[in-house]
Amino acid sequence: IRREENLSIRKFFWIVMAEVIRLTSNDRTSTFKLHARSPEEIQNRNVSALNCFKIVSKRNIKDIASYISVLEEKELIKNGKYIKNAEVKWADTSIKIKSKKKFNLLVTSPPYGENQTTVTYGQFSYLPLQWIPINDIDSTISIDYLKSTQEIDTQSLGGTKKLNIEE
């Protein structure tokens, strides 16, 4: 993947690889949290990461082709390119949005609160993110989010509570 020069193609294959890691690792797929399979289950598993990579790649290519067909039907593709603007920004939810731009959609982590048993998207993402170079994701973000399996969830909920201390 790293030898591919085209960033869009690399990103496609990083997505494939992320799913392959989830499907073939020794982590249980029955939960979003990182829980190792039992030693017996690990010993008895017969999975091929390479075969899984091929299957997921082919499925995702088919899905993209189907999506492109829908965009073409709606005349949103011209000369092989999407004609609308889409901009994605990485932001910190604890800091005020400083922009004069208008936006149609703001996506945030769901408000799943302080409960330690809630869905942990960070743990779900942690293993695949160990493989993907930060510059292929977004060069403006810090890799501090990988310092522990809980850090992504902490950051996506606005970090830790800050006390107002008067000097």
Regions found by a protein language model. Name each.
Residues I1-N164:
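Nucleic-acid modification enzymes, centered on SAM-dependent nucleic-acid methyltransferases
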